Amino acid sequence: MAKEISSELLNTILTRVGGPGNIASCGNCMTRLRLGVHDSSLVDPNIKTLEGVKGVILTSDQVQVVFGPGKAHRAAKAMSELLGEAPVQDAAEIAAQNKRQLKAKQTSGVQQFLAKFATIFTPLIPGFIAAGLLLGIATLIATVMHVPADAQGTLPDALNFMKVFSKGLFTFLVILVGYNAAQAFGGTGVNGAIIAALFLLGYNPAATTGYYAGFHDFFGLPIDPRGNIIGVLIAAWACARIEGMVRRFMPDDLDMLLTSLITLLITATLAYLIIMPLGGWLFEGMSWLFMHLNSNPFGCAVLAGLFLIAVVFGVHQGFIPVYLALMDSQGFNSLFPILSMAGAGQVGAALALYWRAQPHSALRSQVRGAIIPGLLGVGEPLIYGVTLPRMKPFVTACLGGAAGGLFIGLIAWWGLPMGLNSAFGPSGLVALPLMTSAQGILPAMAVYAGGILVAWVCGFIFTTLFGCRNVNLD
């Protein structure tokens, strides 16, 4: 295990969050150890001063400790082992003692709902990145070497092999989402997966593709399984709630036999009658909104400028359903490269701070340690170690990101919309081969690279002019 996540560090963190008895859950996203807590008043915010911790985000019921990619997973695994070995106090007693205080501090329902997306989508992100990279590399090779789509031979076969993972992922993605969502909302994962599969089946007996469900209407009512991801999330939530209500009244002897059976029958009925049409309308509305924002340069600037703030509050995972909706409606994720400009603006701001700092200052050392991850799309080290503690550079970094978003929005407005070839992927320079557009991969890569350059330069200029005044540069 790396030094930064040693058992001593994790024991110190465990002590500062109130001990094992205050831990309700332990998990991780790509860069953060996420600890659910019963009583937030027991949490010491000075966790962020520990060596190896890049930042801390506190909510009423969760502590997010920023370690960075890879390390967060190891930290969560080691913390789970520590919790398994530690003597645990009565969690229910702790919760009861502090219930009133927790209610007073409770964050909004919207923020809590968005936090669920981390639980649903984080396990899928490595697959998104891997499949997207393989597809991007294969598409780039085919473009540069002028390989026709119907070509035969070793190279075309190898390229098709690299592309098949993306096809498999997005064909059956709703089942994975349904499974994770049902669990996140407190239900049984397999029930969510089965309900999600209803959105994947075909209901047109004359169709030549897909798998026919065996009926084309629901007791005479038409079936319209549009709005895949949005509908699946709603259905998984309903499935978990219905399962909880059924289990409450089900005798223990019949629980395994009847609970899932009744849950599936009720949820499927609701899905066909209400959730599928509702999901379709929400899907169309969300797609319309973000497609129009993407085609509006100023809308792109606002989205890119505000994204770092979403990262700070830990609700940036809430954009993932939007990514999936855009993939369905556009064929690529046009929002992701716009939001990626936020990280590029921060790189420019960090370089300006490095330039203005004293040669042997701690600030220069902090920037050197965080700039490479920032260039590769991992922004937390720069956020929590460099810009956010000084505030003004954080604001100018947001302005630099907004300038990059404005650039991409202008290019789209002039007739070259582009986006990521996957619902999710790496940002920064690593994302270059994942860009695509109707005009091909190379124009999309050029637009993305131009946006990054604009964000770097503007972040640097804004920070040099406005972000260094009355700021500690030591």
UniProtKB/Swiss-Prot annotation:
Q: Which residues lie on this side of the membrane: Cytoplasmic?
A: 1-123, 179-180, 239-260, 323-334, 390-393, 462-474
User: What Pfam families does the record tag this protein with?
Assistant: PTS_EIIB, PTS_EIIC
Q: Which residues lie on this side of the membrane: Periplasmic?
A: 145-157, 202-217, 282-301, 356-368, 415-440
Enumerate the transmembrane spans.
124-144, 158-178, 181-201, 218-238, 261-281, 302-322, 335-355, 369-389, 394-414, 441-461
User: What residues does the PTS EIIC type-1 domain cover?
Assistant: 115-474
PROSITE patterns, alphabetically?
A: PTS_EIIB_TYPE_1, PTS_EIIB_TYPE_1_CYS, PTS_EIIC_TYPE_1
Top enzyme class, one word, equals transferase
- What is the protein's major site of localization? membrane
Q: What induces it?
A: Induced by MurNAc 6-phosphate that releases the repressor MurR from the DNA. Also up-regulated by the cAMP receptor protein crp via the binding of crp-cAMP to a class I site upstream of the murQ promoter. Repressed by MurR in the absence of MurNAc 6-phosphate.
Gene3D superfamilies in the cross-refs: Glucose permease domain IIB
Q: Where is the active site?
A: 29 (phosphocysteine intermediate)
Where in or outside the cell? Cell inner membrane
The alphabetized list of GO BP terms reads: carbohydrate transmembrane transport; phosphoenolpyruvate-dependent sugar phosphotransferase system
Choose one Gene Ontology CC annotation of this protein and give it. membrane
PTS EIIB type-1 domain sequence ranges: 1-89
- The catalytic activity of this protein is classed by the Enzyme Commission as 2.7.1.192
Database matches in PANTHER family = PHOSPHOTRANSFERASE SYSTEM TRANSPORT PROTEIN, PTS SYSTEM N-ACETYLMURAMIC ACID-SPECIFIC EIIBC COMPONENT
Instruction: Relay the domain remarks.
Output: The EIIB domain is phosphorylated by phospho-EIIA on a cysteinyl or histidyl residue, depending on the transported sugar. Then, it transfers the phosphoryl group to the sugar substrate concomitantly with the sugar uptake processed by the EIIC domain. The EIIC domain forms the PTS system translocation channel and contains the specific substrate-binding site.
Report further notes.
The PTS domain EIIA required for activity was shown to be the crr-encoded enzyme IIA-glucose, EIIA-Glc.
What is the name listed in the Swiss-Prot or TrEMBL entry for this protein? PTS system N-acetylmuramic acid-specific EIIBC component
- The gene it comes from is murP
